[in-house]
Amino acid sequence: MECSAARVSHVTRRRNRNANIVTEVLNQSAAMTSTDTAMKADGLEQIRKRSEDFAGANLRDYNEYARTFSWTQARALLDGLPGGGLNIAYEAVDRHVKAGRGSKLALRWIGRDDSIRDFTYATLSQAANRFANVLAQRGIKKGDRVSSLLGRAPELYIGALGTLKNGSVFSPMFSAFGPEPIKARMTIGNSSALITTEAFYRRKVEPWRKELTSLQHVFLTECSANPPPNTIDLAAAMAQASDFFETVQTMPEDMALLHFTSGTTGRPKGAVHVHEAVVAHNITGKLALDFHPDDVFWCTADPGWITGTSYGIISPLTNGITMIIDQAEFDAGRWYRILQDQKVTVWYTAPTAIRMLMKAGADFAKRFDLSTLRLMASVGEPLNPEAVVWGVEAFGKPFHDNWWQTETGGIMITNFLAMDVKPGSMGRPLPGIKAGIVEHLEDGGVREITKPMAMGELVLRPGWPSMMRAYLNEEARYKKCFVSGWYLTGDLAMRDSDGYYWFVGRSDDVIKSAGHLIGPFEVESALMEHKAVAEAGVIGIPEPTAGEVVKAYVALKDGFEPSEALRKELLGHARQRLGPAVAPKDIAFRQNLPKTRSGKIMRRLLKARELGLPEGDISTLESEER
């Protein structure tokens, strides 16, 4: 593609809202190619949908649906609490029970040993009631924070719903966190209670527990005969609790969820979400994931990540469908067996997992009967065009990428089932979401750019229900996210003439080289077109003449070994695909690239290690570089 290599026509300065340093934002000129031309140059044609591909889709005519959509109509799809108010857990389970759908399978949990535990909407509601009673009996009240440190265990889902029924605030954490990240998040959140395993507690919490005076109760799963002092055996407490509980009356703007997101530096930010968010969770499930009543849905996201809450718990349950939970870690054969045996119809996963499946090959996927799959979607980081197209080869349909953030609470931009897919694009905004591309002005404001394929910061008009309401106890940090009536996402993007959005990179990831603004995603995608490359991470490193030059880190597919000949071949491949101005000047081989639990390649960590800089917050690091 030539998009990022276009000549720069204008340079402005703005303040980085997180680091408070001056950075340059370069806006692209009219010399950019159109999206279609760029895709054809890469050999990736637009994937045209046939009418039979989206028969019965909830959204069939995007323009008409967007024209008539209102959040008021979306709210009317939910019941609300008897007597007034709104509660996420009530909408997720209780209203289905009251409507006579209690016998429907809500959650199927598959253990590492292939054991199965099924929860209907009625039994899930009763279990959540028991946990709500456990909290209430111990003085945990409305607004108190309840943290969880669990993997994909039934207690996590029961705990989340029971916490919300009690009017308390659910705050999940990655089970892979070490003691310090856990302590930091629970301290910021002023947590009153914690749900975790006995093993996690002994290793990760007990050594510092006395320092967090707000922590009143610790509920342990997988308890031994001799649990640690000042802890509660959750199973025993649940067995003694009533399965009747009247949901605490919460209002739409009452705090419901506290999700932490890490910046490049500094302490974690606690993004506050309210019960009103359920309006967005519900409707985006219908529109972006095309939920229908008989769907079987599998979201593979870690429950410590917001996707694991918004779309791993709330959205499928409010839509009354069946969701699959797998306790085990990734294994290609196991995943395909689950898709086949559980007859999954909608599958929501991450680019990292898709690339790992690609390593196993399309022929491996074809050994399984995956004919029930209707929609495959991806989130976590931009999905490389090659992965989108590989979906057609392996499954007969493309992966549908979408974009959102912890701060937005739900899907904002997506490739809809009934719309053509442009490989590499994020898709189009959800009805009710006003997105734009802006340039930053000298006076601190922003100006919207309407020219197709002009690069700028992706922004959103505030007002959707799942928008974060605050960074907990950090009002100034929160206010910096909003300028001139827009929410600033911190992502650079482009919008084509058809209204599709294209991710370029985080504003602090973009490489400025010899007058060119280079998006790392574009370079990574080009490298991944090569048959030897499994994944790639790209950074800019200082160079006296150009300012920065591109360096790539590459992990190879099975069957390929690092060599100088292969390094030169990849450099030549990239120059041919991207041109000399954008292609990497150096390539380093790695067995693995550092990634977060949500599957994002940690480019800033690659850069810090390359340049000997401080690594900053690495609490979300899952896979280490090697």
Regions found by a protein language model. Name each.
Residues 22-50, 54, 137, 158-236, ...:
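Structural core segment of the AMP-binding/adenylate-forming
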Residues 103-105, 220, 225-226, 231, ...:
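Conserved pre-ATP/AMP-binding loop-to-beta segment of ANL
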Residues 117-122, 248, 256-280:
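Conserved AMP-binding A3 loop
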Residues 148, 180-187, 192-198, 340, ...:
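AMP-binding/adenylate-forming catalytic core of the ANL superfamily
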Residues 235-238, 344-349, 358-421, 434:
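Gly/Ser/Thr-rich phosphate-binding loop
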Residues 279-299, 303-346, 359-361:
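Conserved AMP-binding/adenylation subdomain of ANL enzymes
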Residues 429-432, 443-480, 518, 613-614:
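Conserved ATP/PPi-binding loop(s) of AMP-dependent carboxylate-activating enzymes
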Residues 436-461, 494-498, 561-567, 602:
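Conserved beta-loop-beta connector loops within the AMP-binding
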